[in-house]
């Protein structure tokens, strides 16, 4: 476009030079004209007109109405405007030529007179030829003749040169060749005429030799003129060249667009391929979990059987106890004295165990109650059995009580610490009370003392049995213990212990009736001794846990402070987001990114659904396990405090998550700012590069996902570091032997850091890791067997500890079963947090919604606190259920029933939460898209304030209705149009530079806009090369730094290895601690593996992203370094890794393989260290080596790719060394902090340089993606192998199970717990990529589970009765709360969207009003121009009157004669050219041309010849007007056809609206059973139908009015026949005309106020405006007739002129009606699509909502695009209207002059008749145009009807699907909001249709008035013809007095002019046809575009239907694929 502008400037300068040359020539002619004959005069007179005609045609011909690309229109418009200016200049030159011709006529007359006198003198006085006076006359005549001949020769030379130039440029101007040939023919004729004149002058040359010299000089002058003509030809050639350049520029733009489109298509295909791969992975993963679930079910069935067996044993034991009761009664006196001593001993023992018994106070109190109950049960066995049943009922009632307690504890969430303290005080009080009651019972009486002694003995023995958990073999061997059990049989265990796995089945239960007192006391003392051992051991653990509690509480306080700081940051970010809603284009890109995120969420949701299914099954198993865990109530109570501490840790973790969320907010906001900078460069190619914009949006979305993944990885790393700290503290407090495991954990933490850095490179490692999982499981099996052997050796020494460990393991089984879900749920939590970050950016100005998001985040934090060990609690955190879960755990709900019910509740509510969150994200994305026009990127606006200072004035006008980028683009388009008027070439250059800058910014989205613009303008290639060189240097520097870090890391590895060796050496002596810690380590490995799997998926998504994520990673590194200095090294390595990953996927695979080798090496080291204790691990190591060999095969396959990309081998080696180095960097992080910080700062400064290398990476993206697909396939194969290995491990597990059954019952329970543990490890060890992150979560969850178990036992009795009520009320409250939240969010989001839409419509309305004001001003200018035209017409007629001999002087300045609507006589070539259809169509923005001047050649003596010439020109003008009338009639018929098409299209729109109403009604029928609030939609549709019927009635009324107006037109024709008697009333009518003009302005204002809805059909407006210009004077008369209906349309020429303006407005309204119908269709389609997608969302999933928003955004974008295009065309129409008004003003002045001249009434009548004929022709043309428009409307309506039918069918299908879903109630409120929006839309459509009908009626009325005006004009034209005939008769009389030669010349001249006029009319007709064809093609193109859009929408809707069908399932079960 810049080139086109420059070319326009050059053309302007060249034409200006030519015109100046012509002016100078004319001036010279005026100074030196001599006497010439009439023949010469006639010949030269037409020459200026011919020159002007040639130039005009050459300028206008290239601008024929050929369909130009949309991108060329601006250039052509500016070029045409320049041509208009040049034509005006030519008009001025022609005026000068006309004046010179008049002077030449005078000189010719003088020459004739002098010649006659000379001839007379020669005849009368032949002897006096040498006298002075004749000689003077001869010289004078010779001089005059010489000057004339010189001028003729000059013109001839110019014409000849022009002909030659045209021939030389024939190939470049093929389109002008025909006209050039005509011009050559004309020149030849002129030359022939000159030769003839030369022959005539030969006689004079015989009389005077000087005559021949004069002729020769004249020939020379003619040649000079021909040379000038050649220069004009050169100018034309230059113009054509510039047009060619503009065309080539447009072609280049088209090529760029195609390239971008191809890129976008390729990216879409790649994305689809990745989605397919992800789905395959999900299917395999779901299959794996299904298998594991089956195994868990089998295992827990065995557990249930075992529980039943234990229950039976308990019943037998109770019978024995009843028998022992009688024996104890007989020996009570003997035992009394021993009881006193025993009481003393017991109090002493209890004082020593006080620390442990403090946490068992509540259970002790319950045991006291049970002791008293058992005294009563001794009397009656039936009563005891009944009590046992009551206990069971109470146990089942606890669940309900716990549910009630949950609701109460929700209110006490903030006071949880105080509650814990109060509970501790209560426990102490209960303990003291128990002691007092015990003392009272002992001293009360002997019988009471004996009973108390028996109860205490039984309590002690039972407690000892519950803690010790003796094996069956031991109990068989120890007879005394059996006796004691028999003795204690009278006391039944507490209900919580009946089915506890901690209580084994007694192999013998024989009573001991003869048991002596001494034996009883001995047994009691032995039991107490064992109990004391247990108490001491628990005391040690308690002290350690207290230390850890202090540390964790401190950390919790720190995390709380950090959380508050993060909340403040969140508030600040929220304030910043208020101005971040201005990027409409960014919102579109966000739509794409959200779509990809939605797909990812869908996949994650599927995985989570499967995990939830497994969790549900595990919950059911935990319910069965509940009674087994009751024996561990005392230990769980002691662990309660620890659980609270872990919960505080969870709070801290939540705070950390929020900090990460805030960092992600800042990073994403930075990315948004930078993307807004990119959007500013899309101005010139906005329409063509929409697909490229979508592609870049996808890349940016991937970049955000990479940033998210890095944030998640860093969060995991921080959690792992915290876990390491906790583990170290625990190890220090427990035993020195745990230092080895601390070192091991430390090493694992280092490995985790490495894995986090290489998370994107480990995708191919999954199969190998799964093999390692199998080996690790085998190792675990061997270790377990060794542990069992060790336990057998030290069984008697550590009976108490084994019992406690058994209880813990039983509790950990549930925890481990739940730990599997933790990584997945954390991943889901991270994604939800990312959504929260998006909400923080999007919910500007909506504090309420943002507060809800904060509450959501708070609920997530609380869920993390309360759910720690249980992984489903994380999901409840997202669902807002974590608060209730944690509170219920603190209150002591049982692990079984409570877990099952809450999991079921979680399952239903979690799915709802996920759906609501996704819907919230989608709705917020929609809201952001609608509001981003003025609010989205305030931060970006601040950063670009300096740069956009020059553009703000242009942006302010549209800032409220579009985003900052969108406004900049629109303003740049306007500015480009303005610049196109001055410099087309400069605009082209700027356009190319913008394209290049856009491409580069698309590749480097993070760079600053200032540097990017400076670089991309001139030095892109050079700087790219320099940056590549610097990248290599940077790589070398990084390699050196990596080498340095590697050395330190190696040292750290050596230290870690030494620590591991020490730990292994200590492990032999500390087997029990090792066993406990080994279990923790296994759990950590399992959790870490799950986390590694999540990170691997994140890495896979990052690998597929564009490498522009380096900026986001850099920002993430900066934030993480500020929080933790240790994270700096990890982030730096992550940045380098991502950079290397962007360069080569093969490098990543190699690095992945190397890292896998390192992990294998570490695993070998660990296995070698364990060889000293576990010889059975050799087999596991052998299998590991086999898996490694398989991995080697994969590495060899990867080596093929690595060899092809061998260039990065050195860099991969450096990365490996850096990974090894960073393993030791954890210990040395403090010392390395400063150096790493400096290094990171240097890297950040150089990242800009490194980013340039991504240009080359884009070329390799295709190959890398192919390699990634191969890797994915290999990973799937490895997964299948892993499943096979898992099946083998299951077989090994069954063998281990058989071995475990051979052990004692206590060891059997341990084996059972270990089998459950193995199930968990097999799930987790195969996913070791999340190694250390899961370790921290494992530790936290373990502690929380212990505390939860303890609390469950403590609160069991208290909440037994309230649990049922609380559960019921809690479920209802949660459902109600969730529904209310969902409803509120949906309503708020939709309200915001409606407000944004209303604001946008308001802005458009204001813009339309501004445009209406502009049109009003243009109308005023047209009025002035009309008056000027009227004055010119008056001047012309005055000249004619003077020419008829009335004695009037010629006008001082010739005025244009509007003999035709826009054409003049042939001599007025410029007028012809200017008014050509080409110019009108292609130069809407140009200034109106100067009308052709009407020469006034009348001499002072009123030469009849001059009068005759003027009359001849007038006659020619009349004929031209007649021809134009015919053309206008044709155009009127075309308009009529268009009108018919528009009406048909309107009918189609009506029918489609009815179909839409039917579709909505069907949707209402489907949803009426769920929610009756949607019935309003049907009411709205009824209103719409009513409005349609009303519109139909109005249309019929309009047709009637049209018929009436036609009849009125006929009456007007009869009235115009009598207009001669009414011409005297013209003065009075003039005043009415002014009033009509004012009313016309009002009508124009009313029409312009609706132009904002009429923009889609402005393409056809140009053709209409062209025809309006051709018949401007006629339309002005029609406008007058429109306003002067009261006077029965008795108007003359002025009436026709006014009606012409009215006709123009009618045409605009007609086009507006069509555009309004189109936009109504588009808006209706968009709203229907929105309703459809809303229905799909409420029934299927919230993904449909996001797609709906995307579709709506696309529609809005397309609408905005069309609006801008039509805005340009409207500007052109405004220019045309301004020109028309100016011409109308000129014509008005002419009419006034005619009214003042009563003597010319006869001539005026004749002219009016000619104009009437023209008007009739225009009317015909209008009718044809209306018919074509109606046809077009009909077609569009048919298409819209089809679209509506399709949408209706889709809606019905969605409604049926929706009826099958259970969650439709939650979506009903959202649908209500959509219904309101649809109501508004339907109202809007109704209003638009009403306006359309009004416009149609108005158009019909105006058409009728135009017909009547045409009739009157025809009458006036007939009268003018009669007057012309009279004038011709006079001319014939005058011609008789002239020579025959002059008559012949005049005839030839007239014939030539007639031929030219015929040619001109033919070209105009052809051009009109081309215009119609162009409009038809444009219409078809629009139809095809709509069809494509419909097909695209259908495809997307089907895809969303398939996608949405997956997440929905019945709420009672987990969702399935």
Swiss-Prot record:
<feature type="compositionally biased region" description="Polar residues">
    <location>
        <begin position="1989"/>
        <end position="1999"/>
    </location>
</feature>
<feature type="region of interest" description="Disordered">
    <location>
        <begin position="1962"/>
        <end position="2017"/>
    </location>
</feature>
<feature type="coiled-coil region">
    <location>
        <begin position="546"/>
        <end position="1058"/>
    </location>
</feature>
<feature type="modified residue" description="Phosphoserine">
    <location>
        <position position="1660"/>
    </location>
</feature>
<keyword id="KW-0175">Coiled coil</keyword>
<dbReference type="GO" id="GO:0045494">
    <property type="term" value="P:photoreceptor cell maintenance"/>
</dbReference>
<dbReference type="GO" id="GO:0045724">
    <property type="term" value="P:positive regulation of cilium assembly"/>
</dbReference>
<dbReference type="GO" id="GO:0097386">
    <property type="term" value="C:glial cell projection"/>
</dbReference>
<dbReference type="Pfam" id="PF15035">
    <property type="entry name" value="Rootletin"/>
</dbReference>
<feature type="region of interest" description="Disordered">
    <location>
        <begin position="1184"/>
        <end position="1226"/>
    </location>
</feature>
<feature type="compositionally biased region" description="Pro residues">
    <location>
        <begin position="2008"/>
        <end position="2017"/>
    </location>
</feature>
<comment type="function">
    <text>Major structural component of the ciliary rootlet, a cytoskeletal-like structure in ciliated cells which originates from the basal body at the proximal end of a cilium and extends proximally toward the cell nucleus. Furthermore, is required for the correct positioning of the cilium basal body relative to the cell nucleus, to allow for ciliogenesis. Contributes to centrosome cohesion before mitosis.</text>
</comment>
<comment type="similarity">
    <text>Belongs to the rootletin family.</text>
</comment>
<feature type="region of interest" description="Disordered">
    <location>
        <begin position="1443"/>
        <end position="1575"/>
    </location>
</feature>
<dbReference type="GO" id="GO:0036064">
    <property type="term" value="C:ciliary basal body"/>
</dbReference>
<dbReference type="GO" id="GO:0120219">
    <property type="term" value="C:subapical part of cell"/>
</dbReference>
<keyword id="KW-0206">Cytoskeleton</keyword>
<dbReference type="GO" id="GO:0005813">
    <property type="term" value="C:centrosome"/>
</dbReference>
<dbReference type="GO" id="GO:0001917">
    <property type="term" value="C:photoreceptor inner segment"/>
</dbReference>
<feature type="modified residue" description="Phosphoserine">
    <location>
        <position position="1476"/>
    </location>
</feature>
<dbReference type="GO" id="GO:0032053">
    <property type="term" value="P:ciliary basal body organization"/>
</dbReference>
<dbReference type="GO" id="GO:0051656">
    <property type="term" value="P:establishment of organelle localization"/>
</dbReference>
<feature type="region of interest" description="Disordered">
    <location>
        <begin position="464"/>
        <end position="518"/>
    </location>
</feature>
<dbReference type="GO" id="GO:0019894">
    <property type="term" value="F:kinesin binding"/>
</dbReference>
<dbReference type="GO" id="GO:0035253">
    <property type="term" value="C:ciliary rootlet"/>
</dbReference>
<protein>
    <recommendedName>
        <fullName>Rootletin</fullName>
    </recommendedName>
</protein>
<dbReference type="GO" id="GO:0097729">
    <property type="term" value="C:9+2 motile cilium"/>
</dbReference>
<dbReference type="GO" id="GO:0015629">
    <property type="term" value="C:actin cytoskeleton"/>
</dbReference>
<feature type="coiled-coil region">
    <location>
        <begin position="1505"/>
        <end position="1704"/>
    </location>
</feature>
<dbReference type="GO" id="GO:0019725">
    <property type="term" value="P:cellular homeostasis"/>
</dbReference>
<feature type="compositionally biased region" description="Low complexity">
    <location>
        <begin position="499"/>
        <end position="513"/>
    </location>
</feature>
<feature type="coiled-coil region">
    <location>
        <begin position="1091"/>
        <end position="1438"/>
    </location>
</feature>
<feature type="modified residue" description="Phosphoserine">
    <location>
        <position position="1575"/>
    </location>
</feature>
<feature type="modified residue" description="Phosphoserine">
    <location>
        <position position="1483"/>
    </location>
</feature>
<keyword id="KW-0970">Cilium biogenesis/degradation</keyword>
<feature type="modified residue" description="Phosphoserine">
    <location>
        <position position="1460"/>
    </location>
</feature>
<feature type="coiled-coil region">
    <location>
        <begin position="318"/>
        <end position="444"/>
    </location>
</feature>
<comment type="subunit">
    <text>Homomer. Interacts with KLC3, NEK2 and the N-terminus of CEP250. Interacts with CEP44. Interacts with CCDC102B (via N-terminus).</text>
</comment>
<dbReference type="GO" id="GO:0005200">
    <property type="term" value="F:structural constituent of cytoskeleton"/>
</dbReference>
<dbReference type="GO" id="GO:1903566">
    <property type="term" value="P:positive regulation of protein localization to cilium"/>
</dbReference>
<dbReference type="GO" id="GO:0005829">
    <property type="term" value="C:cytosol"/>
</dbReference>
<feature type="compositionally biased region" description="Basic and acidic residues">
    <location>
        <begin position="1510"/>
        <end position="1529"/>
    </location>
</feature>
